[in-house]
UniProtKB/Swiss-Prot annotation:
Gene Ontology BP, a term: extracellular matrix organization
Native species: Homo sapiens (Human)
Location in or out of the cell: Secreted, Extracellular space, Extracellular matrix
Propeptide cleavage-removed residue intervals: 28-223
Region feature Spacer, mapped onto this chain: 702-779
Protein name: A disintegrin and metalloproteinase with thrombospondin motifs 17
Modification comment: The precursor is cleaved by a furin endopeptidase.
Amino acid sequence: MCDGALLPPLVLPVLLLLVWGLDPGTAVGDAAADVEVVLPWRVRPDDVHLPPLPAAPGPRRRRRPRTPPAAPRARPGERALLLHLPAFGRDLYLQLRRDLRFLSRGFEVEEAGAARRRGRPAELCFYSGRVLGHPGSLVSLSACGAAGGLVGLIQLGQEQVLIQPLNNSQGPFSGREHLIRRKWSLTPSPSAEAQRPEQLCKVLTEKKKPTWGRPSRDWRERRNAIRLTSEHTVETLVVADADMVQYHGAEAAQRFILTVMNMVYNMFQHQSLGIKINIQVTKLVLLRQRPAKLSIGHHGERSLESFCHWQNEEYGGARYLGNNQVPGGKDDPPLVDAAVFVTRTDFCVHKDEPCDTVGIAYLGGVCSAKRKCVLAEDNGLNLAFTIAHELGHNLGMNHDDDHSSCAGRSHIMSGEWVKGRNPSDLSWSSCSRDDLENFLKSKVSTCLLVTDPRSQHTVRLPHKLPGMHYSANEQCQILFGMNATFCRNMEHLMCAGLWCLVEGDTSCKTKLDPPLDGTECGADKWCRAGECVSKTPIPEHVDGDWSPWGAWSMCSRTCGTGARFRQRKCDNPPPGPGGTHCPGASVEHAVCENLPCPKGLPSFRDQQCQAHDRLSPKKKGLLTAVVVDDKPCELYCSPLGKESPLLVADRVLDGTPCGPYETDLCVHGKCQKIGCDGIIGSAAKEDRCGVCSGDGKTCHLVKGDFSHARGTALKDSGKGSINSDWKIELPGEFQIAGTTVRYVRRGLWEKISAKGPTKLPLHLMVLLFHDQDYGIHYEYTVPVNRTAENQSEPEKPQDSLFIWTHSGWEGCSVQCGGGERRTIVSCTRIVNKTTTLVNDSDCPQASRPEPQVRRCNLHPCQSRWVAGPWSPCSATCEKGFQHREVTCVYQLQNGTHVATRPLYCPGPRPAAVQSCEGQDCLSIWEASEWSQCSASCGKGVWKRTVACTNSQGKCDASTRPRAEEACEDYSGCYEWKTGDWSTCSSTCGKGLQSRVVQCMHKVTGRHGSECPALSKPAPYRQCYQEVCNDRINANTITSPRLAALTYKCTRDQWTVYCRVIREKNLCQDMRWYQRCCQTCRDFYANKMRQPPPNS
């Protein structure tokens, strides 16, 4: 849907339905079309004769075809057909095979009335194939219905042939008259920018109560992460409301909805989404009447809730039982992941009255029994954009405006989504992609991982824009009914908004919706994204490929084992129209090693709880980490002295161990297996001898049982011990005999384990309490050159060779900025090509090599010096000192800063102490009175003088009073405005002139009464003309009121009676003069021009 992209291949049933409603006498769209009446015949392979292809002839009229010899009779539902079709001077041979890949076996169109009644299942009457002798050709036909005629599309390159039976013909399609039309495909162009509509969407969220106490363990959940697959299928139920079915008609509504859902399918195939989402319709329900349990009205939320309950009762059912899919028998209802209800009822958000809302959905409701619903208003083919937007909410996508990084841009999930673009022009934002990935990684999306095995998806059809299938007239009929046509006098504006004329109306009307992309708007032009642009070729098929991996991120930890990641983008090149998305993952994680953490440092999980505790306004130091077994990568913290953990974060930081004694790490919220080779997901394990991926032959296992113990204690010869001196230790880890010993106690059961190797002899002691004992089972290993613990060294056999080897690498000396790793030099014994690590004393010290050195952690440091604010000067007058805190900190992935060693920070340490000079005592500022506001009409400033009274001018600048301040004054905004003087009220002698005098605001132009009355200009003045005839008294028309009427006179009000008024000499009466001002004014003028009578 972004610029230059195209629609993916259309699904077969949509193309078939596009031609069912054509009038035989009407061409499709505005493209040139030929019409013929032909007789298709079924033939045998021996009857096929492929002559050379002639050039395409010009337009033709109807002709009657010849009748070929007898052929096999076609029977509906056959698997394969070979048809002969004489068309436009050519013999076309159609090789067809029955094709049901676009439907699930359980798909059906159901018409439901007052009593629920299922329609018959779809017939096995859909065929697809090719035209023999025409490489790249495509045929999609149906032979459905009682009449059994052929309906569908034949495509030969850029030429399309539409076929349907004549209305007056009956019988099987073989040998039956059919009407064919030929049109030439047009090439699409890159889209232009579109306009934003003001249409509203409402997303409903589920309110969750906070969980206290230990979280419950859902038996359906597993520790292993749900891996993000490259393809997911949303099996969708679509229900058409009764008012929509009545408006369009059942057949047209079926065609319309399938076309819309195909557009929705194409939008979710767009490369910008990054994940292939198949929106597949499993059932279409056409309501003849609304069921009693389904309440649809103006209140949007109530309508959506009612539909959700109704669809769950009618078409719901358990999709999963634990982690097992419910088997699908032939009588089972089709699986439903989402449900869409389309209505022509105008609904609204939060109120029970019509408004501009066009869609409502539950956020993240897919797969939920009573939240997987979308409510959409039928507003023409733009319904596709509404459904795509709301299904995005259903799949966990928020509005782009909810993300600061995506706000203010034009994408499908914009708060006011862009209308006027089609699926080839609209794209998904990176925030929508991230929201979708997070939703699909959650366990609530598991229904999308299993698709109805009866479903088939693909069919190879050419890319077409929707406006190439619906002409402007047909789009008007969808919006305003079958009596509507396109307004030709609005053709110059048609791409900005589709204007239609309904039969019987005198003016055109519009819903401000642009026509579909591909609608012709002139010679070699069509509408794209709301503009009329030239046609350009369709881009070629291009599969996406990955860009090179980016640089590794910083390690998530400053000490110990952590995780880092790197990213790549599918833009080298990006997937083109119909192209596939890049296979594999866009993010890769790896283990990173740092220097061991200092002793006494809290665990990484505890540090995260403490960081949250520091940010909390409550008392500090109260939270400690708790690992929940079935949710190891969620951060639970427990208040001190309480056993109820609190969920603090949905996931811990990358590199957090999954448990206190585990090597597996949490990465992106999922517990990942870490092999002994340090690779995420590796299956490498240490053998019993502690060798990674070893065969267990380098050591000898010693084990046995001892049955005289009640409690156990462990002690080395260096006096380190556990449970000694009659003291019982808490479970944990202890450093004894040069190794880490782990002690676990559960009730009376105890376990002591250590990885080794030990450097001192260990003594296992038994503490005897009471009389009952439970026994001890022990196991330990010794190198093959030793037989038992504390046994003296055996003599070295003559065939043994002891040499120094580099057995491994130490950790990096620094965590960033470039450090060194050194090899571990070990003594190795070689016997019969078998190597074994032995004590260093077995090898000669004189030949011990120097360790090898390698550079490591070359990435820049994220550690930096952080300096706090300076303290106040130690002296209030004269010289003193200031102090501040300077710390070396490291930034974690979540933005939290933790203190680290000063050697990790680059550059010199900022100064922590500096000299300062206190302000001289008794230094004060002096300010004068405020001046008048600098503006008399609007905003201005007050000003005053501010001076330092100290002789040296060392007043504290931070306490200096303001010298300017904003002010507003509107006292001088009104003034007198005058109009032009009118013509003189008299044509002779003395008269009056008038003008308009008004008090108006300088800025707004509004009338007011604040102007000074003394300065008001005169509204009247005297004027003088030539001397008048004495017979007419000039004063009768020179009064101010009569002059004003004369000035304002435009025409007579009583045209019929004004001649009588003049003859009866009634013009001097102001009441009659006002109604016949033009006649009376001319009467006086003529009187003044007449000469006086002879005396």
